[in-house]
Amino acid sequence: MDARERLIVGLDVPTIGEAEKLVSTLGDDILFYKIGYQLVFAGGLEFARDLAASGKKIFLDMKLLDIDNTVASGVENIAKMGMSMLTLHAYPKAMKAAVEAAAGSGLCLLGVTVLTSMDAEDLADAGYSQDPHSLVLRRAGQARAAGMGGIVCSAAEAAEVREIVGPDMAIVTPGIRPTGSDHGDQKRVMTPFDALKAGATHLVVARPIVKAPDPRDAARAVLNEMVGALWPANR
């Protein structure tokens, strides 16, 4: 995969019109888009289908979690939509049900470990006794055991996660901030170059591109950082 196949731009905008404008602005530079709750609830599912039909890859970031049958039913329908990736929370029973439901569809299921906006204090407030690092590694192992296609984690854990999940699973890392950019609400961040070096296969970048004065220039800057990490001489 080259850099364009590894960069996922988060369409974190409130309206379909804004999303369409952004996709048009980015043009052929960007092949992969993430669509989450904000856009889904503004009519984004139909938009996602249209983007997929136009040749773009779509990461549907729904973070599903429910009883097994409900998760399986949802995944079965999403698998028919032409999406490339789908997230669900990395709970063993839900993951196993989803894997069975998506079998043969080509949909890559991603287990969400710990949100990159959360730190140890946040987990403690939510009732978890484990620190983020330990919980990420535990859930990565559970995702592998369930047969998931990949996991979502911060780039800070990517190297150790790779040791746990082996060479074939995708490691998708949000919380990516280009060199010199503001961290925003993210607490566990890394640059595109360092994230790929750490073992990530795909990088999710939203605000540094979406909110940039020139989104296309910002996207190209991220791609250039990624190329630096992927170039054989730097491996």
From Swiss-Prot:
Record-level Gene Ontology MF annotations: orotidine-5'-phosphate decarboxylase activity
Gene3D superfamilies cross-referenced by the UniProt entry: Aldolase class I
Pfam family name, one: OMPdecase
One GO CC term, this protein: cytosol
One biological process term in Gene Ontology: 'de novo' pyrimidine nucleobase biosynthetic process
Residues engaged in binding substrate: 12, 34, 61-70, 116, 177, 186, 207
Record InterPro entries: Aldolase_TIM, OMPdecase, OMPdecase_AS, OMPdecase_bac, OMPdeCOase_dom, RibuloseP-bd_barrel
Catalytic activity: orotidine 5'-phosphate + H(+) = UMP + CO2
Enzyme active site: K63
SMART domains in the cross-refs: OMPdecase (SM00934)
Keywords: Decarboxylase, Lyase, Pyrimidine biosynthesis
CDD domains according to UniProt: OMP_decarboxylase_like (cd04725)
EC number from the UniProt entry: 4.1.1.23
Pathway info: Pyrimidine metabolism; UMP biosynthesis via de novo pathway; UMP from orotate: step 2/2
Domain of life: Bacteria
NCBIfam families named in the record: PRK00230.1, pyrF
Family stated for the protein in its record: Belongs to the OMP decarboxylase family. Type 1 subfamily.
Subunit text: Homodimer.
Role of this protein: Catalyzes the decarboxylation of orotidine 5'-monophosphate (OMP) to uridine 5'-monophosphate (UMP).
Protein name: Orotidine 5'-phosphate decarboxylase
